[in-house]
Swiss-Prot record:
Belongs to the purine/pyrimidine phosphoribosyltransferase family. Pathway: Purine metabolism; AMP biosynthesis via salvage pathway; AMP from adenine: step 1/1. Catalyzes a salvage reaction resulting in the formation of AMP, that is energically less costly than de novo synthesis. GO terms for molecular function: adenine binding; adenine phosphoribosyltransferase activity; AMP binding. InterPro entries: Ade_phspho_trans, PRibTrfase_dom, PRTase-like, UPRTase/APRTase. It catalyses: AMP + diphosphate = 5-phospho-alpha-D-ribose 1-diphosphate + adenine. Keywords: Cytoplasm, Glycosyltransferase, Purine salvage, Transferase. GO terms for biological process: adenine salvage; AMP salvage; purine ribonucleoside salvage. Pfam families: Pribosyltran. This is Adenine phosphoribosyltransferase. SUPFAM superfamilies: PRTase-like. Its main location: cytoplasm. Its EC number is 2.4.2.7.
């Protein structure tokens, strides 16, 4: 049943070759999000391992992590914490820089978004290099969170981001893998 469910979810992802540049296959989850059944299945699958447990906050990475993370937080009766690009949050923040293919970027979180000891799940749509997710985990831990897991709809395993998180002691849960990027 679970394998069939994830196969149907994988079929709901649109693959766009040569976007945003030649040689890249963009995995577009907007088709999954626009289909009520697929969206429900994805959220239910992300929630299932944590239902009935104590999850204080779900942290979502801008922007698609907001959509998925908000739905997961709702189902778990948890709070939701947005992790945004630097300069987008109005209150006092803590931030961290991380490496991109060419250069660096920075993400931030409100300093009062997490209480020490909060049990947190990190959610985003896709993990590739793991740079943003690693930075997010570091921010959450800096504020005293216990990062229970990092959850993604899609993993691009050959790029190694999920393993990078595992090497930091983070449990990684993904719903599907795509080869090629």
């Amino acid at each position: 049943m679970e394998a069939r469910r994830h196969s149907a979810l994988k079929d709901s992802i649109r693959s766009i070759p040569d976007y945003p540049k030649p040689g890249i296959i963009f995995r577009d989850i907007t088709t999954l999000l626009s289909d009520p059944r697929s969206f429900r299945r994805a959220v239910d699958s992300l929630v299932h391992p944590y239902a009935g447990g104590r999850i204080d906050q779900v942290a979502g990475i801008e922007a698609r992590g907001f959509i998925l993370g908000g739905a997961v937080a709702h189902q778990l009766s948890s709070g939701f914490v947005p992790i945004r690009k630097k300069g987008k949050l109005p209150h006092k923040t803590v931030s961290t820089a991380y490496a991109l293919e060419y250069g660096t970027d920075e993400i931030e979180i409100h300093v009062d978004a997490i209480k020490p000891g909060d049990r947190v799940i990190l959610v985003d749509d896709l993990i590739a290099t793991g740079g943003t997710a690693t930075a997010a985990v570091n921010l959450l831990r800096q504020l005293g969170a216990e990062v229970i897991a990092a959850c993604f709809v899609i993993d691009l395993p050959e790029i190694g981001g999920a393993q990078r998180l595992r090497d930091l002691g983070v449990t990684v849960r993904t719903l599907m893998e795509f080869e090629g990027h």
